[in-house]
Amino acid sequence: MTATSPLRVVREEQLARLGGDTFDMLIVGGGVTGAYAALDASLRGYRVALVEKSDFASGTSSKSSKMVHGGLRYIEQGNLSLVRHSLLERQRLRRNARHLVQRLPFLFPVMERDGVFDKRLAKAFESLLWTYDLAGGWREGILHQKLTKAEVLSHCPTFNEAYLTGGFMYFDARVDDARLTLTLARTAAFHGAALANHARVAEVTRNAQGRVDGAIVHADGREIRVRAGVVIMATGVWLRDWDGRRKGDAPALQVRPAKGVHVAIPWLKIRNDCTVTIPVPGRNRRATITRWGNVSYLGTTDEDYDGNLDNVYCTRQELDFLLEGARSALKTDLQPHDVVGSIAGCRPLVGPPGGKTIEMRRNHEIHIAPDGLVTIVGGKLTTSRHMAEQTIDAAQTVIGKRAPCRTKSAYLLGAAGYDPQAIVASGGLAAHLGERYGTEARFVSDLIDARPSLLAPIVEGLPYSEAEVVYAARHELARSVDDVLSRRTRARLMARDASARAAPRVGQILKAELGLSDALVASQVRDYVAAVQYEKSVLIGDNG
């Protein structure tokens, strides 16, 4: 599937469709699961609407570890079936979103002591890696490797040599989670779905017989009545606060938010060329350090969270936890002031309180209420396609229709005909745009050809250009400064302070492209800068 012109989703047209059309399926929640469900249903030929109260991927789906993997620890938990299935889904994503999903080497150092595991357990760990390869890791085209001490240091020169004896490397994949989610939503629109971000569902409606028949949506100061044969709640951890059921009805599923944080550090302080797994001293835990552009991001944590789901931040305590592990494993004295960005989000685990969240299985659950409301929650980024398939299968039973799933081999926008090896090898602007837009990169290049001044960088020290902001406004449903700097680009994670300085210019471009008022632009810039400052104050620990 290759578009000959850039997809343009006009907001006014989408809102008019929400109020004027009757849909087979209304999906609430614009994270990766909801976006994949919208694509799945659209490809089956259904009339689909997807609404999101904030921005696409503004919740958990932009704050993951950005890994598309089977998960070695799921083998350790005995969940081999999840690993097999995840590795199969990984390869489907590697094909269908080949411009976004890249191979990611994982390095496990072997230590005499004080490591993720010691030398005595190395043989057992290698058996685990063989199990991983046989479960589906081989589909990546390369099996795990045993490394010498020198080879480990060649991949991460700053690793602490004390007690290091060697290591193992195996191969998975990574993705810009926010761009994947956005691309899924845009591909759904390409196939006919109606999309609206910044559109909040205020109420799930029911007919005289008590059956779900749509929702009331608030967007741009108006109230829109959306009619649909079935409503799917795909709101992730937000199901904890509101799940669309009527007052008095028992909750369908028990959601347990588990908070995870990552912090970004200048890559030159680490100099890793792969994901390095490190121990956290005295915690029986491990963390990872992954290179992404000019930063390496360090994570993650896994703890219960009962706070405000719309305002989740990395705290000083969590930062110290991660830096303690990094300082122990590396010959680099990382300090809080070295951190250039952070993300914090919550995983939507399914289950009751009790026990450690890190030990809970990452399975998903789908529920069909007696009134026809369908709910999906749980799972993980890697298995989102399969979760969506099962969700639409369930929704079909509500509306009494049946059509086969087509997403197993469906290319996302930008993937068909894209040659990642050739584009990345070319380097420079072509490689940067290729890894973000795939074959759609030519549309961004067209903007630059028409107006060369758009090649100007938008954020100091990062490769994003003004052309990408224009493209985000015209073709990627960006409505705010935060949409652009946090998700259409990843400037807030990679260069928090520089992104705040770029906010006024982003606001001016959005004003010109979207016709925003001076007052609204000023408000967006002010809110973004304030949010960045608050994030920083919580991280450093001086927020009172």
Go through each PLM region and give its residues.
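Extreme N-terminal leader/targeting segments of oxidoreductases
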Residues: 1-25, 40-44
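Glycine-rich Rossmann-fold phosphate-binding loop(s) that bind the pyrophosphate
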Residues: 29-31, 53
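Core beta-strand elements of the Rossmann-like FAD/NAD(P) dinucleotide-binding domain
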Residues: 21-23, 221-230
